[in-house]
Amino acid sequence: MGKVGWSDLHEDLIDLLANNLSSNINLLRFRSICKPWRSTVATKKRLHNHFERNLPTFKKKKTVVSPSTFFRVTLPSPCRNKGWLIKNRQVSESSKNNLLSPLSGKTITPSDKTLDLLKVECFRDSSILQLFADSDRVVFLDNVFFVVDFKNEIWCCKSGEETRHWTRINNEEAKGFLDIILHKGKIYALDLTGAIWWISLSELSIYQYGPSTPVDFYEIDNCKEKRLVEYCGELCVVHRFYKKFCVKRVLTERTVCFKVYKMDKNLVEWVEVSSLGDKALIVATDNCFLVLASEYYGCLENAIYFNDREDVSVFKLDDCSIITKQINSSSSSSHQSCFQMFSTSFF
C-alpha cells in the first residue's frame, strides 16, 4: 500500500482532526497545511468552544465563554532557546483576538506592530468565563463545558446550539468547589477543604478521589486560595496564604507564602513539595501550569509567579522570599530581571 500525502487524506479524517482543536489559532495552523484542508475546514462553524449561555447563577445576564491560549514567543537571536510568555484570547467567533497579560488577564495595550501567532509556539489552551469576577475556572471536554462559579458550584453545558441548559454537578458531602482541571482525559475538581473529586462524564456525578490536603490550625484563616496543577504527570494542590497589613492606614491583604502538595501513593497521604526543580509555576487567573525556566528570559527555577492585586510577584521556594515587580521599573535591572519573561519588548 502506497503512502498517502497530507493533501490526499479523506475529508472525514480531516473533519475528525479539526473537531478536536481547541482554539482558533490551532484551527488556523491546521487550515494552513494545504489547500484541500483549508477548503474542507470552515473556520466559523468549528469554534464550538465560544458561546453565550445564561448561567443559572446570573439569570438575567449572559455568561460568555471564550477560548484562550498561552504562547511562548521567540525571535531570531543568539538566544533562540529563550522566549517570552503571552496570552491570546479569542473575543468573538470571527478572527478578532486580544493579547493579554499571562498572570492578570488584562488586555495589553496594542502597538503599531503585529505579532504573527502562527509563527510562535502554542503550548497551552484554556477558556475564560467573562464578565464575572472569581468565575475563571473553566474546562472543555467532549463538547461540554464545566464551570466553577462564584458560589463554588460546578455547572456543565454542551457547547452545541441544540441546548442551552446548564446542569449542576453536586455531591451532598462536598460543601463547595474552588477549582477544576482536565487531567489525562478526565475532569477533576478541588473542594473547599483541599480534597480532589472526580467527575463521571457518563453520569454527570462527582466522587471524592482523595483526602483533604493538610492545613495547620494556625494557618486555616490565612489559606484563602487553593488551586489544582499538573506536576510530573500527577495532580498537585497549591495553597496560597495571605496576611493583613496596614498600608497608609488602610488594611489590605497580601500574599505571603505558597505551599505545593503531591500525593504519596505509598503512604496514601499528601506531602509537601520542597522543590520544583528546574520548573517555575505560573498561577494565572484561569489556569495553573509549570514551565521550564530555562526557556524563558529571566525566569527563576523553583519559583511561583503570581499576580497580587495590581502587582506581579514571584515566590522563591528555596528561601520563601517574595520579589515584587516595581511599577515603571525596567525588567532589565538585576533585581527585576526575573520578570523579563512577561515583557512585551518583542513588539
Swiss-Prot record:
Q: Which InterPro entries match?
A: KIB1-4_b-propeller, SCF_F-box_domain
Pfam families attached to this UniProt entry: Beta-prop_KIB1-4
- Domain F-box span(s) in chain numbering: 4-51
Name the record gives this protein:
Probable F-box protein At1g44080
